[in-house]
Amino acid sequence: MSFSEKIKSLPDQPGIYQYFDENGKLLYIGKAKSLKKRVKSYFRFNPFRPADNLSPRIYKMISEAKDLNYIVVESENDALILENSLIKQLKPKYNILLRDDKTYPYIYIDLDEPFPMPQITRKVVKGKNIKYFGPFSSGASAILKTIYEEIPLVQSKSCLRSGKACLYHQIGRCLAPCEGKVTSREYMKYVDQAIELIHDKEKILEILNQKMQKYAENLQFEEAAEIRDRIKSIESAEIYSHVDLAKLEDLDIFAVEIFNKKAVVIRIFVRQGKVVASSNSVINSQTVPEIGEIYTRAILEFYSTETPFTSSKILVGDDFEEREWLSQVLSEKFGKKISIITPTTKERKSLIKLAKLNALEVIKNQKENTVLDELKILFNLQNTPYKIEVFDTSHMQGEATVGAMVVWEDGKFKKSDYRHYHLEGKDEYSQMRELLTRRAQSFEKSPPPDLWLIDGGKAQLNLAKEIIDSTGANIDVLAISKEKIDAKAHRAKGKAKDKIYFINEKLKVKSEKLNIDKLELSQSDKRLQFLQMLRDEAHRFAIEFHRKTKRKKDTQIDLLQVKGIGKAKMTKLLNYFGSFDNIKKASFDELKDVLNEKDAKAIKEFFKGQK
């Protein structure tokens, strides 16, 4: 069946459609209330060509399209959910994908518990009487730490289970409900104080400033510096505004600014009339994106995660076609009326103005991506690699085998997205296969990047491409390796040159699955130095985790040799303290509380002998 005949035979039902180019590469994913009507709207049929009323970006996409697939679903809402999920997983060439994939932390309290404790979450927590505060773009941990220092609440669920007062009670930072020293009713008064403090960021900052001043006066500079960092973390979430929202309303605000081929989405969160947090996403597009599609994508991506919805109004800077329908979708998802509105009052217009000013600042501060653009041209990449994931493995004679992934995005290493893995593979090839496969399996939760950079040669490049193709994602891949001297790859500068392996579609090689080419660049070449920097960071991170893993393993083996410390006691220690480092730091009394005096003494002697 020809392409045009396939389009004419589409069903008049809701679903998603996928366009592919002549090589079978995915170009675009869209949703439709009626597949037949929506897809036909892209074309003219006499002769068969793209419709005249398309935007430049969509016109270019349709000009490249040579085939399509579709999936029928029960409703338009189902189509929306499936479309959003597939776009994030597969990264089609012409879809808009926001760079900011993170979820935001909330502080929550489960008021159904007899002795509730504030905790941090990034998703909905099961429970009928959960109270959420946030979101926080930064400072959530700093706020929580301050609350626990000021108000004597339960600080660990394990304390309640133990039935014995812990160290926090001894220093006056817990009321010891585990020993019945406070009733649930009395305890709830302190919970109310904590809730008041969470709402009052100015009061928290006042408390912290007083503490910092006191530490400085007592020449306790390390403690003062820690408090200073906490203050900065809390303050950095603020966008200062002179807007006074007398109604003390809650709003989630989205605003978009487009400049040339760049677009910025700003999110601002207002709680009880105060701006409490903000974030932004940068969209780098090959062609100018449409503002309506950006709003739809930004709102969908933010609320597609299991994020608590603590507001009931979303304020947007511009009207767009799918606004009312999107309100219905979110209302169904969260089980309450959610309105997506444009500003009508002076105060709300001022908030949108504030958001757009911040968006322009983000655009102004964006660095030129010269090296990234040059890499795209040099290796004929599908997309400019704004986000790059770099992989390496590390082991010592097959022991403590680990893998590492580091991430480069928006002109810097994004350490919050770094990941390390314990690997089972016996050789470097199988280790890399395991590492890349495990990363690919998480594309649904953590969308793929523009480029994978692998530490290795042809075999690793072939392997990476095989795994990428199995997912259907649009990701470019490069491999970097040292030439071998005396059968060994030398990382030290001057001993050997780095080779870059890439897929060259113009190269015709019958004996291989892929047309793999290699390139040696001058040591002074900025493009090579950039790739080396990425590879070296992945190597550093892998080595660091390998050493830590080996130390931990060695410590565990040695500690088990201590008389009287078996696996059961080891498990008990780890469950209580959380890590070997914490066991090592624990005091004699803390160890004695978990085990007994004899074991505590043996463990302290063991760690003393390690120094």
Swiss-Prot record:
Localization terms from the record: Cytoplasm
GO cellular component, one term: cytoplasm
Coiled-coil ranges per UniProt: none
Chief localisation class: cytoplasm
GO molecular function: DNA binding; excinuclease ABC activity
Pfam families: GIY-YIG (PF01541), HHH_5 (PF14520), UVR (PF02151), UvrC_RNaseH (PF22920), UvrC_RNaseH_dom (PF08459)
The name this protein goes by in its record: UvrABC system protein C
HAMAP family in the cross-refs: UvrC
Domain of life, source organism: Bacteria
Domain UVR: 202-237
UniProt keywords, alphabetically: Cytoplasm, DNA damage, DNA excision, DNA repair, Excision nuclease, SOS response
UniProt cross-references to InterPro entries, sorted A to Z: GIY-YIG_endonuc, GIY-YIG_endonuc_sf, GIY-YIG_UvrC_Cho, RuvA_2-like, UVR_dom, UVR_dom_sf, UvrABC_protein_C, UvrC
Domain GIY-YIG: 12-96
GO BP terms: nucleotide-excision repair; SOS response
Subunit structure: Interacts with UvrB in an incision complex.
